[in-house]
């Protein structure tokens, strides 16, 4: 589309280019002719397949409130390049092991002698051979020589650039004689195997480039630079990235509006013919802030009357502190867009789905008053029905279930995604948890199947399932690869769908073959040069042997062995169980009897890590992987961990801790933990559940988490129906349901849980020494009451009716 500017940065690691739609040209745009890329079934897609999930919803969602209006400083002027485009044109990879070394140097004229605070992204900067002094760079009046050298070389760096504040008078138009220095012997593209922290070639390239960059930053003038780097080549202005609209929002400096600047801004909230009026102010732009009332995702839609060239910048954030500080989720996420107006009426619906709660609309380059008619969100999610529900005597638990369900919905498009704002990506480990949550909350079996298929297809190119798909980041997280295997088991257990199991069975086998090749012959443990990750805790994790990977591997072997007869290959089960026993024996041999725990890792020289965490013990409890003599300590580490054990940081890992507590027969403790872990979110008015537990991720930050909407944290959707309602599938296909509610935490509870046969509902209430339980279930489901420690003291009165 010609109006879409092409020379723009990416939104984030996994998202497409920044949306900048220039509609200011009065003439009809000239479209380029289409070019044949490949025959319909001959491209990298191999073949066309029928859609296997529903189209996304489109629902108008209005803002709840107009929050504020401000005058803000005009936009920063940026000088930036996209390193991939310069070094590897056409490449779309974002691997951390990619090496993107280059230098940019240019002359720029300053209108006066001044100190300037330069905004930077991904680069170190020198001006006339000097760095910053007290955070500011000194510019002479007239010509100045500027050098940019990348801080990091890896492929996650989408932009190398700087921004000049508007009051400095330094502009991109004043830049001249720009040169680029490439380092072809150091530049490389490489999949993340080995991962950058374990990649000797990547580390060597970094070591070789660092002194070159440091030397370049000390060069005071162009002539010295060209002498040092004779391979420098002119860089055309067209190779520079367009103005970075998001940078100007991040660095906004707000001032109060004055009378007459903005009239009737609340009119924008309503879809009628009334208009807010925003008038131009000399030397300032006007910013309007709106509140959706809760986090949401979709496409911005707006209508306004404006002069040609008026710029509309739209940016959204998830959270702002009580003192007004804005949290920009990142790093490197441009959760914004730009629209440049034509003369007269402008109506636009954004092409990219974006998320947030607080939305900032900044009008720039106004030459005449703007009449702003409407602004809304076209909500776009997977079209789910809330078949699951939960209500009990504790209002906080009801709200926790509600925001968990909303979070999951916002992280569902044509796949499960990690979050609606930062990446919008199918992370395979996240998807395993989200699949369980979605089956027990929405009955979204089609999306579960789709995610299993998509992730499994990565085995065409990799020995184990990739950590995220589809992707330009070829990275394996072994724990995620094993969790993909669990997803296959989870789906079969929930639905009894043997046909789908047989479809993906070759993928299950190949994933385990890749894992078997990673077993270290010396230790007998899983060892891989990958991103070895499970939780965001700050443990000793940069090594090939992380012990939690061996626990996950052992469980993947067990689940596959159970599935083998269903898939028609029962003879495979014994071999996998033997591998599992070998892994468990190897794990227990490295138990630290002094610290009564497993070391977190084994270093490349054979040294045992000095770190110990709760994670290995809770996985050993969950997966039945501890020798008898270690089980008491494993239980203690899981239930009452000592202070020296690294704790769980993310609600993602909490899911596995909760599951371990259930395995240990402590369902009440899980309900207590849900209240303890999620209440801090409620206390600050969260409308979705967070990526991290408050304050554990970064105790020194004003912001309690990175992502404020992360569906890997929606574990209450799984455990509240299972424990508080007591709805427990007893076998594959939910043909039989056990009813065993934990009743000593609440006075009453009710709700529903979907199954492949329809919804199962439970309503229970204590009346003196009687416990009344009403169950509704489809006729084909067998229902059985299972007493537990909390029900023994009651006379149970159970009734059942059809759904």
Task: Describe the role of every protein-language-model region.
Residues 1-418, 430, 446-447, 451, ...:
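Extracellular/oxidizing-compartment recognition motifs
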Residues 2-20, 668-803:
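Non-catalytic C-terminal accessory modules of carbohydrate-active enzymes
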Residues 299-316, 359-364, 424, 428-458, ...:
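Alpha-helical support elements that line or immediately flank enzyme active sites
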Residues 630-639:
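Alpha-helical repeat scaffolds
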């Amino acid at each position: 589309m010609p109006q879409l500017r092409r020379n723009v940065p990416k939104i984030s690691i996994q998202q497409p280019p920044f949306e900048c739609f220039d509609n200011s040209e009065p003439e009809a745009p000239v479209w380029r002719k289409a070019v044949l890329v490949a025959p319909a079934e001959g491209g990298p897609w191999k073949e066309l397949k029928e859609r296997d999930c529903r189209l996304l919803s489109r629902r108008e969602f209005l803002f709840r409130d107009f929050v504020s209006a401000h005058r803000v400083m005009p936009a920063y002027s940026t000088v930036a390049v996209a390193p991939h485009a310069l070094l590897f044109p056409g490449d779309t990879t974002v691997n951390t092991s990619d090496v993107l070394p280059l230098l940019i140097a240019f002359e720029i004229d300053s209108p006066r002698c001044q100190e300037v605070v330069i905004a930077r992204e991904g680069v170190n900067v020198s001006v006339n051979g000097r760095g910053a002094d007290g955070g500011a760079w000194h510019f002479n009046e007239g010509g100045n020589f500027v050098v940019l050298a990348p801080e990091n070389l890896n492929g996650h760096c989408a932009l190398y650039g700087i921004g000049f504040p508007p009051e400095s008078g330094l502009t991109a138009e004043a830049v001249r004689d720009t040169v680029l220095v490439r380092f072809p012997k150091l530049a490389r593209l490489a999949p993340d195997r080995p991962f950058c922290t374990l990649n000797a070639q990547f580390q060597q390239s970094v070591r070789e480039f660092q002194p070159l960059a440091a030397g370049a930053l000390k060069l005071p003038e162009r002539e010295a630079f060209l002498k040092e780097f004779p391979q420098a080549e002119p860089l055309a202005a067209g190779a520079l990235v367009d103005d970075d609209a998001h940078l100007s929002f991040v660095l906004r400096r707000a001032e109060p509006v004055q009378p007459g600047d903005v009239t009737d801004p609340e009119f924008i909230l309503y879809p009628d013919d009334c208009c807010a009026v925003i008038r131009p102010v000399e030397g300032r732009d006007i910013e309007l802030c709106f509140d959706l009332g809760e986090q949401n995702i979709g496409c911005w839609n707006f209508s306004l009357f404006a002069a040609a060239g008026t710029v509309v910048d739209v940016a959204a954030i998830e959270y702002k502190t009580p003192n007004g500080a804005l949290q920009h989720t990142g790093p490197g996420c441009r959760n914004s867009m730009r629209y440049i107006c034509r003369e007269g009426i402008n109506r636009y619906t954004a092409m990219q789905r974006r998320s947030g709660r607080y939305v900032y609309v900044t009008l720039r380059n106004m030459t005449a008053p703007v009449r702003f008619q409407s602004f809304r969100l076209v909500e776009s999610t997977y079209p789910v029905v809330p078949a699951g529900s939960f209500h009990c005597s504790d209002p906080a638990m009801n709200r926790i279930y509600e925001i968990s369900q909303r979070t999951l919905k916002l992280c569902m498009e044509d796949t499960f995604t990690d979050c609606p704002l930062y990446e919008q990506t199918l992370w395979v480990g996240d998807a395993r948890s989200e699949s369980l949550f979605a089956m027990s909350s929405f009955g979204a079996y089609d999306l579960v199947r789709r995610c299993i298929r998509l992730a499994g297809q990565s085995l065409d190119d990799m020995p184990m399932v990739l950590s995220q798909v589809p992707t330009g980041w070829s990275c394996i997280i072994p724990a995620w690869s094993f969790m993909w295997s669990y997803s296959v088991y989870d789906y079969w257990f929930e639905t009894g769908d043997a046909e789908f199991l047989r479809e993906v069975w070759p993928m299950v086998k190949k994933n385990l073959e890749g894992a078997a090749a990673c077993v270290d012959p010396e230790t007998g443990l899983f060892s891989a040069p990958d991103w070895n990750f499970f939780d965001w805790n700050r443990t000793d994790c940069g090594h090939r042997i992380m012990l939690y990977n061996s626990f996950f591997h052992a469980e993947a072997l067990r689940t596959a062995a159970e599935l083998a007869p269903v898939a028609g290959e029962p003879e495979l089960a014994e071999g996998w169980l033997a591998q599992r026993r070998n892994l468990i024996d190897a794990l227990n041999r490295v138990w630290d009897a002094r610290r009564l725990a497993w070391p977190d890792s084994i270093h490349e020289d054979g040294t045992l890590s000095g770190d110990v965490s709760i994670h290995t013990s809770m996985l050993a409890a969950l997966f039945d992987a501890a020798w008898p003599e270690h089980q008491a300590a494993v239980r203690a580490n899981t239930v009452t961990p000592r202070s020296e054990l690294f704790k769980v940081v993310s609600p993602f890992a909490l899911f596995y801790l909760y599951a371990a507590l259930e395995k240990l027969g402590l369902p009440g403790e899980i309900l207590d933990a849900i209240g303890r872990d999620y209440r801090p979110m409620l206390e600050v008015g969260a409308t979705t559940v967070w990526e991290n537990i408050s304050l554990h991720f970064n105790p020194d930050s004003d912001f309690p988490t990175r992502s404020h909407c992360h569906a890997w944290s929606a574990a209450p959707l799984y455990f509240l129906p299972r424990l508080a309602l007591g709805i427990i599938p007893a076998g594959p296909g939910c043909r039989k349901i056990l009813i065993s509610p934990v009743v000593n935490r609440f006075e009453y509870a009710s709700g529903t849980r979907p199954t492949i046969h329809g919804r199962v509902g439970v309503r229970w209430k204590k009346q003196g020494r009687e416990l009344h339980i009403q169950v509704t279930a489809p006729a084909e489901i067998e229902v059985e009451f299972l007493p537990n420690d909390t029900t023994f003291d009651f006379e149970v009165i159970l009734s059942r009716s059809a759904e």
